[in-house]
Amino acid sequence: MEEGKITTASLPGEGKAPRDAYAGYIRRKRLLLVVLFVAVVGIAVFSMTMGSLQIAPADVVRAVFGQGDVRTVAAVQNIRLPRVLTAIVAGVALALAGCAYQSVLRNPLASASTLGISQGAAFGASLAIIIFAGGAGASAAYEGISTADPVTTALFAFAGAMLSTVVILLLSRVREMTPESIVLLGVALSALFTAGTTIVQYFAEDSQVAAVVFWTFGDLGRVSRSQLAVMALVTVVSAVFFFANRWAMNAIESGEGLAHSLGISVNGVRLANMLVASAAASTVIAFCGIVNFVGLVAPHVMRRVLGADYRFLLPASALAGAGMLLVSDILCHVVVSPLILPISAITSFVGAPIFIYLLFRGVSR
């Protein structure tokens, strides 16, 4: 064989090396996803063992399927399982939304909180509570709080969150803003909505202000089964949409120039992803209240572990978000038991140190 005709494929075993390396790459990513899934299931079962009625893990599993002691089945299916499912669905939705924001804006700081979506929801909820106070939505844990009907509050919170998204998208289209400018615009809107919430509270009665503050605490236990079904539906639709756009997100991650050369409408993908991500995040915030750091930290951590391949980053972020919210919910119940701490405070206490560590680790590199 002539020297000029020798190729890698003609050498024994050489043609298989890249293929084997790629297969190993895929296996490692899939193995991590399996580990994350098993961890989430384990945390969920452990979470349902805790409470005033201590239940063994095996009994929890049987109770989920309606088997075992009547009291145990009632405690698991009526109280603990809905709360755990709410934590999983909310964690998945917020993490997927954060992953999508960080992808299309190419900014690791993009999340529902930094884009003003959480603050817009708080403003909408404040209006609902103060305008329609006196309904049947008072919490049993806070006697004397005057609040609006939960459905009305959720609708106003959703409207406020989507208002922030619409303003960002409209202004970014008018001025052709860069992804960095969009995040800065979100920070400005956060301050604006926070100021609006403060002014609304200033003119409210004490009981109404207490209701607004209680709503912003965040609470997974106040989500009804019908609200959980709505959250789950929105989350599933959003997940399908994001996964269908995984290759476009990979292309944008490699550079907008490359994405354009592949025939991808970067602005169109950015618009669609932001709308779907905002719908998912807004739905969760409307029903659960403010839940900080899940949409920021979970995708950021998984990006450090897995890289920016959205075929694996999306499901990994979803599982990490579910796990983070489950762990936070457990801490809510055990830190100062029998009191239950606000979920937003615990997610911040859990997420902020992790994020600071990742930032310092990145700087040291």
Locations of the language-model features?
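Alpha-helical transmembrane segments in inner-membrane proteins
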Residues: 2-365
